Curated annotation (Swiss-Prot):
Keywords: Ribonucleoprotein, Ribosomal protein, RNA-binding, rRNA-binding
PROSITE patterns according to UniProt: RIBOSOMAL_L23
Family to which this protein belongs: Belongs to the universal ribosomal protein uL23 family.
Pfam families: Ribosomal_L23
Biological process according to GO: translation
Name of the molecule in the record: Large ribosomal subunit protein uL23
Annotated GO MF terms: rRNA binding; structural constituent of ribosome
S-S pairs: none
GO cellular component: ribonucleoprotein complex; ribosome
Subunit structure: Part of the 50S ribosomal subunit. Contacts protein L29, and trigger factor when it is bound to the ribosome.
Keyword rRNA-binding appears in the UniProt entry: yes
HAMAP family referenced in this protein's UniProt entry, alphabetically: Ribosomal_uL23_B
Length: 94
């Protein structure tokens, strides 16, 4: 298993993530692309000391970006994890 600080890269804070946290108690993280659901669950439980009920993941391709006229590039691909805490567990990240 990877180090927990290599699995969880950062917390994703957006309007959608804030609404999810307020309504369903789900947290949204940007995680390592190679991390699986079991590693994400263990990393959140160890880092924050909370019990995790479920983890959903989504892979995102990097966007195409242009610099100057013809130099085309791409931003990095990344992975998002939606983590639902167990009943009675709360965590305020916002």
């Amino acid at each position: 298993m990877k180090d927990i600080y290599q699995v969880i890269k950062k917390v994703r804070i957006s309007e959608k993530a804030t609404m999810l946290q307020e309504t369903t108690g789900e947290l949204v993280f940007e995680v390592d692309r190679d991390a699986n659901k079991i590693e994400i669950k263990k990393a959140v439980e160890v880092a924050f000391g909370k019990k995790v009920a479920s983890v959903r993941t989504a892979n995102y391709d990097g966007k195409l970006k242009r610099q100057r006229r013809s130099d085309a590039g791409r931003t990095a691909h990344w992975k998002k994890a939606y983590v639902k805490l167990a009943n009675g567990e709360t965590l305020d990240l916002v």
